[in-house]
């Protein structure tokens, strides 16, 4: 059986495995120029409370970034949620990962391929509707665009591998044109880019969202960074060893004794003797 719905439609949680893995990759490749890891917060499937007058109203983005806030709440505690009026900061970036049946919630009138630059006034989600139970929370689009004014709102579909970017300009979201063959967008306010990268993450090879730097290089995860560091150390050690070998060979060929070569290069006599025998001893 595949993709069966929950028996409780109100049950919260991640809709699929991709919604767990993709946010991890976003957080683990994030490297900001002006904010260290202790001065930014990333949330995944976390309640984002946005209206102090209606303190229970919230949205739950798949992933969001807030900069210039402590990584830990009040500098010492993990967050259970993110309360905008308490933190004094709204997200700079929100990423939603499309799920079947949720397109209108995430994209509003942009669900269709056609972009409506001047939507009819009656489609604007800027009014809070009322019903018999009272005031209802506004649409997600209104919250991100009008209430929080999130500078960058990005939507990605794992089914089509399509990335869409909406940038907040003059009070409204404007969709940014991306190259379908190489979808990337540069977030100038944060000096970092986001694009669609095809590769392996957590043992799964597919298209993923991933951050890149000003030179266009994909930013590594912490694991990849450590692997690169270890490889660089290995190569540096091999280079030093090769230089020592060459220097020892040159000195021996010049007529110096093994003791003299060992003293000059700081090597053990046995190493120099081994070099005499093999010509390629690795130190």
What are these model-derived regions, one by one?
Residues 278:
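Alpha-helical DNA-recognition elements
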Residues 1-45:
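Charged, glycine-rich intrinsically disordered N-terminal tails and low-complexity linkers that flank
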Residues 37-39, 44-81, 85-86:
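Short, His- and charge-rich active-site/binding loops that engage polyanionic ligands
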Residues 1-15, 32, 53-54, 72-93, ...:
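C-terminal interaction segment
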Residues 265-275:
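Short, basic interhelical loop/turn and adjoining N-cap
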Residues 23, 27, 60, 91-92, ...:
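Generic internal hydrophobic packing segments that stabilize the cores of diverse globular domains
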């Amino acid at each position: 059986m595949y993709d069966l719905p929950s028996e409780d439609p109100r049950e919260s949680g991640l809709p699929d495995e991709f919604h767990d893995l993709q946010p991890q990759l976003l957080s683990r490749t994030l490297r900001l120029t002006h904010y260290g890891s202790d001065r930014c917060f990333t949330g995944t499937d976390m309640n984002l409370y946005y209206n102090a007058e209606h303190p229970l109203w919230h949205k739950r983005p798949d992933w969001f970034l807030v900069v210039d806030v402590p990584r830990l709440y009040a500098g010492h505690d993990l967050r259970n949620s993110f309360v905008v009026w308490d933190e004094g900061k709204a997200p700079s970036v929100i990423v939603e990962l499309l799920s079947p049946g949720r397109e209108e919630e995430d994209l509003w009138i942009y669900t269709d391929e056609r972009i409506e630059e001047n939507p009819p006034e009656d489609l604007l989600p800027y009014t809070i509707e009322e019903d018999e139970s009272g005031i209802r929370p506004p649409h997600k689009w209104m919250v991100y665009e009008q209430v929080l004014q999130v500078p960058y709102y990005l939507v990605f579909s794992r089914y089509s591998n399509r990335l869409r970017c909406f940038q907040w300009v003059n009070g409204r979201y404007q969709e940014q044109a991306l190259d379908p063959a190489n979808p990337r967008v540069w977030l100038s306010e944060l000096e970092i880019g986001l694009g669609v990268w095809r590769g392996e993450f957590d043992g799964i090879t597919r298209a993923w969202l991933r951050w890149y730097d000003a030179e266009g290089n994909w930013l590594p995860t912490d694991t990849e960074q450590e692997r690169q560091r270890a490889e660089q150390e290995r190569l540096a050690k091999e280079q030093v060893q090769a230089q020592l070998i060459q220097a020892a060979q040159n000195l021996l060929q010049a007529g110096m004794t093994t003791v003299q070569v060992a003293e000059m290069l700081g090597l053990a006599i046995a190493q120099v003797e081994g070099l005499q025998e093999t010509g390629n001893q690795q130190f």
